Amino acid sequence: MNSQIRQNFHQECEAAINRQVNMELYASYVYLSMSYYFDRDDVALKNFAKYFLHQSHEEREHAEKLMKMQNQRGGRLFLQDIKKPERDEWANGLEALECSLQLEKNVNQSILELHKLSTDHNDPHLCDFLESHYLDEQVKSMKELGDHITNLRRMGAPSNGLAEYLFDKHTLGEDHE
């Protein structure tokens, strides 16, 4: 059945949105894995766990916004299998944050490609949507992760376990309580 509201919404953009939904859900899944790793009794970094749980919820919300927009434009949502995170263990907080930064860069690159596609197909609605809800937020997220990585290294992580504990308690504790 064809949508009666669809206008100036190219099928390539529709398909790319479905792929972006999958990428956002994958990112949410990775952050969920990280959260519950740091919540384990043998890791016990509760603020890392809270931080990554918050990130997971944020990524899921990004996916939901895209799904809602897909429907508003008369597109069709086709969910795909969500890939399992590449790992189940995170050696330390620094490594998890470095993986998070790479994940955010990958998500950002995908959003930039979606923006280019929407520009190429002369779709100002999709361009505006991405600019309003995603592009600035991605840059801020990457900056925050970069700052966290720098500060953890400055404190002596990963070789200094106390650095990770203090970072968890003082930096993540005050940011995300």
Swiss-Prot record:
Note: There are three types of ferritin subunits in amphibia: L, M and H chains. M and H chains are fast mineralizing; the L chain is very slow mineralizing.
EC number: 1.16.3.1
Single Gene Ontology BP annotation: intracellular iron ion homeostasis
Reactions listed under catalytic activity: 4 Fe(2+) + O2 + 4 H(+) = 4 Fe(3+) + 2 H2O
Domain Ferritin-like diiron positions: 7-156
Annotated GO CC locations: cytoplasm
Keywords per UniProt: Cytoplasm, Iron, Iron storage, Metal-binding, Oxidoreductase
Complexes and interactors: Oligomer of 24 subunits. There are two types of subunits: L (light) chain and H (heavy) chain. The functional molecule is roughly spherical and contains a central cavity into which the insoluble mineral iron core is deposited.
Superkingdom of origin organism: Eukaryota
Binding site for Fe cation 2: E59, E104, Q138
Organism: Xenopus laevis
UniProt xrefs under PROSITE patterns: FERRITIN_1 (PS00540), FERRITIN_2 (PS00204), FERRITIN_LIKE (PS50905)
Locations listed in the record: Cytoplasm
Similarity remark: Belongs to the ferritin family.
One Pfam family linked to the record: Ferritin
Gene3D superfamilies for this protein: 1.20.1260.10
Gene Ontology molecular functions: ferric iron binding; ferrous iron binding; ferroxidase activity
Function: Stores iron in a soluble, non-toxic, readily available form. Important for iron homeostasis. Has ferroxidase activity. Iron is taken up in the ferrous form and deposited as ferric hydroxides after oxidation.
Family matches, as InterPro entries: Ferritin, Ferritin-like, Ferritin-like_diiron, Ferritin-like_SF, Ferritin_CS, Ferritin_DPS_dom
Name of the protein this chain belongs to: Ferritin heavy chain, oocyte isoform
Residues the entry annotates as binding Fe cation 1: E24, E59, H62
